[in-house]
């Protein structure tokens, strides 16, 4: 069984990004990512600190706009409009969740597609769905594809199962696998025979957000297992959406939790940001 080490691959990606950032700086372009955070959600604060640290490591200028929880939707949209117009800002990321009085979809849609560091704008998602290259892609599925490449797993002709249908991971993940000529199935909470679907999959991507929902005994012998899930149990232990030990005994390759997909999601945010900066520099 091959353990697909997300930390190791993310470090490689960061090295590549740092080289790109230096090349842009030599041409007078200082790559910049702006993060907008509303309120004082503790988890959001931790995530933003991590993103700032990642940016520092590769030479990207990171700016945070931390707004009070009372910020109105109009005020937030006005800030995004200013950032869209600022040539020093190459990527914009709005940290979720937003307060309940703010329309999350309206805010994300207000980000210019040309500055959409998360790859969530409908224009960019639509471009992905019809195979247009050169647009930012959602970070987690993009990170999964890079992990498959690094593990020398070619999706072409293989049965791929994506467990989860979110707009952030599941749906774009399925599109990226389809783009690479996999035969793709999407399963979800209402799938009638999840065990049967898992048992047929050569590549399994679990992204449903339920601790150890996918039993290791279901996994096809020799399958590649990518576990996007990150769930904290009552005892504080972090586990994925797949029973790791039992699945690892059957899989040819598997990602750990933690230390698997998580570091790659953050690394691909840096990739998106530098790619957006390169478009401006052309």
Swiss-Prot record:
**SUPFAM superfamilies (UniProt xref):** Aminoacid dehydrogenase-like, N-terminal domain, NAD(P)-binding Rossmann-fold domains
As recorded in Swiss-Prot or TrEMBL, the protein's gene is named: folD
Q: Which GO terms describe its molecular function?
A: methenyltetrahydrofolate cyclohydrolase activity; methylenetetrahydrofolate dehydrogenase (NADP+) activity
Its Enzyme Commission number(s) read: 1.5.1.5, 3.5.4.9
Keyword Metal-binding attached:
no
Which residues does the record give as NADP(+) binding sites? 164-166, 189
Task: Please name the pathway.
Answer: One-carbon metabolism; tetrahydrofolate interconversion
State whether it acts alone or in a complex, and with which partners, per the record: Homodimer.
- Span of the signal peptide: none
Job of this protein = Catalyzes the oxidation of 5,10-methylenetetrahydrofolate to 5,10-methenyltetrahydrofolate and then the hydrolysis of 5,10-methenyltetrahydrofolate to 10-formyltetrahydrofolate.
Write down the superkingdom of origin: Bacteria
One GO term (biological process)? tetrahydrofolate interconversion
The name this protein carries in UniProt is Bifunctional protein FolD
HAMAP family in the cross-refs: THF_DHG_CYH
Instruction: Provide the species name.
Output: Anaeromyxobacter dehalogenans (strain 2CP-C)
Q: Which reaction does it catalyse?
A: (6R)-5,10-methylene-5,6,7,8-tetrahydrofolate + NADP(+) = (6R)-5,10-methenyltetrahydrofolate + NADPH; (6R)-5,10-methenyltetrahydrofolate + H2O = (6R)-10-formyltetrahydrofolate + H(+)
Listed InterPro entries: Aminoacid_DH-like_N_sf, NAD(P)-bd_dom_sf, THF_DH/CycHdrlase, THF_DH/CycHdrlase_cat_dom, THF_DH/CycHdrlase_CS, THF_DH/CycHdrlase_NAD-bd_dom
One Gene Ontology cellular component annotation held by this UniProt entry? cytosol
* CDD domains recorded: NAD_bind_m-THF_DH_Cyclohyd (cd01080)
Q: What keywords are assigned to this protein? A: Amino-acid biosynthesis, Histidine biosynthesis, Hydrolase, Methionine biosynthesis, Multifunctional enzyme, NADP, One-carbon metabolism, Oxidoreductase, Purine biosynthesis
Show the Gene3D superfamilies listed in the entry.
Leucine Dehydrogenase, chain A, domain 1 (3.40.50.10860), NAD(P)-binding Rossmann-like Domain (3.40.50.720)
What does the similarity note say?
Answer: Belongs to the tetrahydrofolate dehydrogenase/cyclohydrolase family.
């Amino acid at each position: 069984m091959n353990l697909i080490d997300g930390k190791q691959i993310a470090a490689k990606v960061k090295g590549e990004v740092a080289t790109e950032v230096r090349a842009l700086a030599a041409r007078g372009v200082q790559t910049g990512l702006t993060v907008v955070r509303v309120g004082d959600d503790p988890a959001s604060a931790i995530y933003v600190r991590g993103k700032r640290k990642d940016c520092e490591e590769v030479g990207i200028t990171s700016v945070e706009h931390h707004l009070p929880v009372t910020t109105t939707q109009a005020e937030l949209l006005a800030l995004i409009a200013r950032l869209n117009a600022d040539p020093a800002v190459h990527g914009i990321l709005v940290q979720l969740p937003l307060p309940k009085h703010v329309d999350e979809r309206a805010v994300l849609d207000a980000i210019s597609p040309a500055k959409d560091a998360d790859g969530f704008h409908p224009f960019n998602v639509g471009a992905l769905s019809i195979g247009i290259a050169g647009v930012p892609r959602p970070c987690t599925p993009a990170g999964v594809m890079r992990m498959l490449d690094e593990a020398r797993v070619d999706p072409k002709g293989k049965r791929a199962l994506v467990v989860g249908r979110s707009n952030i991971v599941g749906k774009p993940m399925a599109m990226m696998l389809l783009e690479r000529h996999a035969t793709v199935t999407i399963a979800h909470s209402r799938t009638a025979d999840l065990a049967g679907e898992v048992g047929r999959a050569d590549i399994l991507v679990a992204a449903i957000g339920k601790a150890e929902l996918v039993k290791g005994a279901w996994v096809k012998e020799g399958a590649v297992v990518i576990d996007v899930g990150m769930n904290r149990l009552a005892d504080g232990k972090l586990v994925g959406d797949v029973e790791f030990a039992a699945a690892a005994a059957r899989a040819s390759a598997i990602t750990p939790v933690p230390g698997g997909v998580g570091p790659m999601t953050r690394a691909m945010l840096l990739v998106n940001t530098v790619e957006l900066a390169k478009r401006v520099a052309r």
